[in-house]
Amino acid sequence: MTNTLDDSIGSMQNCVSIVRDTSLKLRSRAQTPEETERIKKVLQLTRKYEEVTQSEVLAAQQRQAAEIAPQVQDLIGGVEKQISSLHSKERKLKSQSELNKSRLEQFPMTRREVVDVPRDADNVVEVTEEELQELEELQREREKLKMEISRLNLEKRKSVYGKLPQ
């Protein structure tokens, strides 16, 4: 606020200086009645600039601050709401990430882990196409059950710890 006041005062002083310089130049040229009339107007303008007191400048500055302050507060409130919304979204995404991570950890990484059959050359097992399809169907069923268990665990956590953001 002080910086703005200093800038305003400096600007006003610059304007007064320019008007004074101009009036001096006009006075030196004042040789005709038309120029004399013009000089009178310039001098009146100079007096108006010089009549603005520091208290008037401060009063104008206070009026301007009072006018702008509510708008600034509204803008700050809007920004705070947006930040709150972003924090909520962040918590929601973290929760979803943790859930997906736990689900991913439950899934087998390879088919070898699913079957749990050692692949040694001495221990070769022949499987028919029907048995392979049945095994794959059982694996799919097992995955569905794991997903259901994961969902139920999440619901249980929600009921125990309160509702998590969606």
UniProtKB/Swiss-Prot annotation:
Gene Ontology CC terms: cytoplasm; DASH complex; spindle microtubule
Localisation: Nucleus; Cytoplasm, Cytoskeleton, Spindle; Chromosome, Centromere, Kinetochore
Keyword check for Coiled coil: yes
Keywords: Cell cycle, Cell division, Centromere, Chromosome, Chromosome partition, Coiled coil, Cytoplasm, Cytoskeleton, Kinetochore, Microtubule, Mitosis, Nucleus
Iron found in the keyword field: no
Major subcellular site: nucleus
Stretches assigned to coiled coil: 119-160
InterPro entries: DASH_Spc19
One GO process term, biological-process aspect: mitotic sister chromatid biorientation
One Pfam family it belongs to: DASH_Spc19
Function: Component of the DASH complex that connects microtubules with kinetochores and couples microtubule depolymerisation to chromosome movement; it is involved in retrieving kinetochores to the spindle poles before their re-orientation on the spindle in early mitosis and allows microtubule depolymerization to pull chromosomes apart and resist detachment during anaphase.
Subunit structure, as described in the record: Component of the DASH complex consisting of ASK1, DAD1, DAD2, DAD3, DAD4, DAM1, DUO1, HSK3, SPC19 and SPC34, with a stoichiometry of one copy of each subunit per complex. Multiple DASH complexes oligomerize to form a ring that encircles spindle microtubules and organizes the rod-like NDC80 complexes of the outer kinetochore. DASH complex oligomerization strengthens microtubule attachments. On cytoplasmic microtubules, DASH complexes appear to form patches instead of rings.
Family to which this protein belongs: Belongs to the DASH complex SPC19 family.
Protein name as it appears in the record: DASH complex subunit SPC19
Species per Swiss-Prot/TrEMBL record: Yarrowia lipolytica (strain CLIB 122 / E 150)
Lineage: Eukaryota, Fungi, Dikarya, Ascomycota, Saccharomycotina
